[in-house]
Amino acid sequence: MNTILLQNLVNPNVNLQVVLPEMIVALTGIVVMLYDCFVPRQRKVTGAISLIGLAISAFFLLSTWNDPAYTAWNGMIAHDGLRLSFSLVFLFTSAVTILISTVWTDRENVPVGEYHAMLLFATFGSLFMASGNDLVIIFLGLETLSISTYVMAGLRRNDLRSNESAMKYFILGSFASAFLLYGMALVYGATATTNISEIALKVADPNFPALLLVGGSMMIVGFGFKVATVPFHVWTPDVYEGAPTPITAFMAVGSKSAAFASFLRVFVLGFPLIAGVQASEFLHESWITALSVMAILTMTVGNIAAILQDNVKRMLAYSSIAHAGYALVGFIGAGMARSDQERDSAIAAVAFYMLTYAVTNLGAFAIVTLIAQKNDRRTAFEDYNGIGFRSPVLAFTLSLFMLSLFGLPLTAGFMGKVLVFRPALNAGNTLLTIMVIAAVINSAISAYYYLRLIVVMFFRERTTDWLAPRIPTALAAALLITVIGVLYFGIFSDGVIESFSKSSAVNAIRAER
């Protein structure tokens, strides 16, 4: 018996090291839940435990940064550049969300232990969505993330808006998951496998079954919901507005990044060149056209709707839809890449874009959380009137985040957009060139609502009494980290994108470990 157990432990297909970051995050979540059972409502302790667990997970992830790419667990787990870069985004997002949440958990009557545990379990699911090289693993990771997020969205049990947000997210999220799962089932029926690497080989065959196209289309619907692309975006504004602000920040960044990681792995690596130009040029052009139109609509609808908003959270919700469209430009560029190196660079660009979006958006939501007060009472534009003179630190910091979201040069948002647009522009395709032009025009349109908030803060008089809130230490740390990130990634982005590209190229995957 001991010999069999030892053989399993040293079996290259059962590599515990490759899933160590995920295991650490899951175990930390369990520890937080157990601690909260015996010593409830210890916000600082459960928060500290969560941050330590995330830091240890990041340490083990970084220790494997220069390892060659490989798969493990019978090909179900992939260790490559896509996994590494996106996993760092998830861990960073969760850590900053915990720091932002301190001011919220202090003033709201929420079960803080459950909140930290759910956030860790959501991160655990996100990590598997990036590392999963099998449709089953990706779906399990997605559901772990989704269920945890449903719970967090409804943590304010006595708030009708929070309850409505959680219910809408649960119903529509379940509907999208059903589409995704049915699509995966059809792909399995067409290819007799759920392994993404094996699916890629099947797609390259010109005689692949038509059922594969139906399955792929249904999976696009499922991923489109999770990413919040048009026309699958309708849930986003109501859910983002009703959910507690720190949870909204996590959903806007963490959930979206995780969905993009899986989207890239399935449709760029599993369906090479987006359903395989080797199989059918007509089919290839059809996929490109459909996704390009989706990207243009997502950017345009998101920006136009954001202009019409009078609530900052709803404005940021529609802004996140537009940013999903920008990231989709890089996704399509990766699918159109003419070589493995170009494809890896495009994937790294999308990961970098999600990192810059995370840094900027989390910083903005940190200030919104601080100003909103209990039950998010102050989230309208008029609540920001004149705060530039009463709290210049908050106003100037929020202005920096708005300018980065717009894409002002020397900010992280600018470099993120430049790098994510480049692969599509280099593809030499007329439709993709039009898509990039549309993205640039939409970026210019977005200046209206981002600058509107800045104008409100500095050029509108306040008609009500307002005292500048005290900035807690943890939230000050979150703001400092995000401000440094916005400036650093805007000026010194070359090193980061090069590291993402070289971490371990996805095309280098060869053998099991």
Name each region found by the language model:
Residues 1-513:
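Alpha-helical transmembrane segments of multi-pass membrane proteins predominantly involved
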